Every structure is written in C-alpha cells, then in structure tokens.
C-alpha cells in the first residue's frame, strides 16, 4: 500500500522516474532527505516497492499527494512541462504494468484522470461494486486524448545498506518497540505510523527481530 508520508526520511533512492530538476538542484538519482514532501515521499515509496519486487500497488486518493498523482490540462497550459519537476503517476501507471508487470488498484472519487489508462473501472454504489468501464471510457473519450502515457526510464537499485555495528557481540545491539508507531535500533528510530497494515505491537517486534537478524548476518 502506497501513500504520501510527509516528513519521512529518504536515503539514496532513485526517484528520477517521477521527479527531476528540483529547484535546489538536488540529485534525484540518489535522493536523500530527512523531511520529505508528500510528492517526494510517495515517489520514494513507489521505487522502494519496485525494488522489493512488489507486483501490485494499492493507492487511495485520500492519502496521496495530488501533485504526484495527477496534473490536469489547465495546469499544463499555465505551467509548461519543462518547468514542472514532477512526472505524475498517471503518466507512468500504464508502463508500470506493461513493462514491469506491476498492477495498480486506485481508489478515487474526485478525479477521472485515470479513466483513460484504466483496464477496469468499478463504481461502489451503496457498498455494492458495479462494472462501469464502458461508461467511464465513453465519458473519457469526450475529454480529448487524455494523459500522456510515458515509457519507463531506467531506475537504479544499487544502494548499499550500512552494516549494523554490534561491536562483535549481538546482545549489544538494542532493539525496542515503541508502541504501534515506531521501532528503535540503538539511537535510530524507524517511523511506522503510516504503515496502516500493522495491527499490533507483536508485528512490530517481529519486524524488528527480522531486521536485526538481517543486519547482523547478511548485510
């Protein structure tokens, strides 16, 4: 499940598939920040999911960065593509499936921009799903050619994780569960408040022990 995570840390992630030419000239091929915006955090989340081998993305419009998801025709007329650093997800979603086999399920209620590129459109009518693909495609056809579906550009996955420093003794490396919101490794805190799939602290503890084992045995 992907969402915007304002304020999250991003370490050496290639987000150039979606974001380039930032005003401060930061390198988006190896993007780093301790305080990501909604768009940069969601771009990083997509690339990290690709790197992990995910084959389906679950996206909710309500928890996404609008400027990452869409860019309408009027905005493109005022702010030219060459002046905008963000390539919206709607222009990459088709290629993610065609070239990488990654499907996307998007819940949306305010924009029909994805009707042009969707394989299926399902309407929820009083909690009952209805197939409305034909109607959505016909309606979208009346709004011109729709979005510009772009091919994917190469993404780098050559990050090298930093080895856990245990001083040769595994017991010296401390892992602590901080409620359902975070996990602490020595002095480093892993923020988990936006990972909605986590239901209890036992899951966080299991994740912590898995990371600790991987960090001390495989990295």
Role assignments for model-derived ranges:
Residues 15-19, 58-70, 175-182:
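A glycine-rich, aromatic-flanked flexible loop/lid motif
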Residues 37-50:
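Conserved alpha-helical scaffold flanking the Walker A/P-loop in AAA+ ATPase domains
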Residues 32-39, 79-86, 100, 104-108, ...:
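Hydrophobic alpha-helical scaffolding
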Residues 49-93, 97-99, 110-137:
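Conserved P-loop NTPase nucleotide-binding/switch module
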Residues 1-35, 70:
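P-loop NTPase switch/communication element
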Residues 45-48, 92-95, 206-210:
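Alpha-helical scaffold segments in soluble metabolic enzymes
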Residues 1, 32-35, 55, 100-104, ...:
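Structural beta-strand/beta-sheet cores of well-ordered domains, especially the beta-sheet scaffolds
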Residues 98-101, 107-219:
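Conserved NTP phosphate-binding and transfer environment spanning the P-loop NTPase/kinase superfamily
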């Amino acid at each position: 499940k992907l969402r915007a995570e304002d304020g999250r840390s991003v370490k050496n992630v290639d987000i150039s598939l979606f974001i380039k030419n930032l005003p401060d000239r930061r390198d988006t091929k190896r993007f780093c920040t301790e305080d990501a915006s909604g768009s940069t955090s969601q771009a990083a989340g997509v690339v990290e999911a690709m790197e992990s081998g995910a084959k389906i993305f679950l996206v909710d419009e309500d928890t996404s960065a609008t400027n990452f998801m869409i860019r309408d025709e009027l905005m493109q007329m005022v702010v030219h593509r060459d002046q905008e650093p963000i390539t919206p997800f709607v222009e990459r979603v088709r290629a993610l499936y065609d070239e990488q086999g990654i499907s996307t399920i998007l819940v949306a209620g305010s924009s029909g921009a994805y009707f042009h590129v969707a394989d299926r459109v399902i309407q929820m009518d009083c909690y009952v799903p209805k197939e409305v693909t034909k109607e959505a495609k016909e309606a979208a056809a009346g709004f011109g050619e729709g979005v510009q579906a772009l091919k994917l550009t190469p993404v780098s996955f050559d990050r090298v994780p930093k080895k856990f420093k245990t001083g040769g003794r595994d017991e010296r490396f401390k892992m602590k569960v901080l409620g359902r919101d975070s996990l602490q490794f020595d002095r480093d805190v892993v923020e988990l408040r936006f990972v909605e799939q986590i239901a209890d602290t036992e899951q966080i503890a299991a994740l912590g022990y898995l990371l600790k084992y991987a960090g001390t045995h495989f990295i």
